[in-house]
Amino acid sequence: MTTVTLIGTRLADTGREFVYQGESPDCEGCPYRSQCLNLSEGTRYRVTGIRENAQTLDCAVHDAGVRAVEVEPAPVPANVLSKQAYAGGRVSLAGPCPHTECPSHGYCVPDGADFDDERVIDQVLGEPPHDVCALDRDLTLVEFRAEDG
């Protein structure tokens, strides 16, 4: 489902993905609050279109202002335990990982998915980018279904 919202002009690129973090204290009193704060906190979104002929509006959060874009909830790539990795299955993430230097860290601790949430696997992507898991986990890279924002 496409939603029209306002985001920072520096972020307004078709295809860009972001996780909506919610309201900033600087949003208080802004006349555009209802257009900016209309997404679901913690949900990953993809910009699918940029509204043409829309003006750039001043913003206390974004230094270059905000502009109107169309967004849709986006799938979340993530590593899950291999024994649970099948399309259509409901799984949770394997758990926290302190190894931030690992090429898979962004998939083991993905933006837009929480450890205590069960998510539906949309598709199995295959091997994760790391050679060996430092926590000795047998992992598979999957894509979680986009959540309805």
From Swiss-Prot:
Secretion signal, residue range per the UniProt entry: none
Highest taxon in the source lineage: Archaea
UniProt family annotation: Belongs to the UPF0179 family.
Protein name: UPF0179 protein Hlac_2319
Organism: Halorubrum lacusprofundi (strain ATCC 49239 / DSM 5036 / JCM 8891 / ACAM 34)
Source taxonomy: Archaea, Methanobacteriati, Methanobacteriota, Stenosarchaea group, Halobacteria
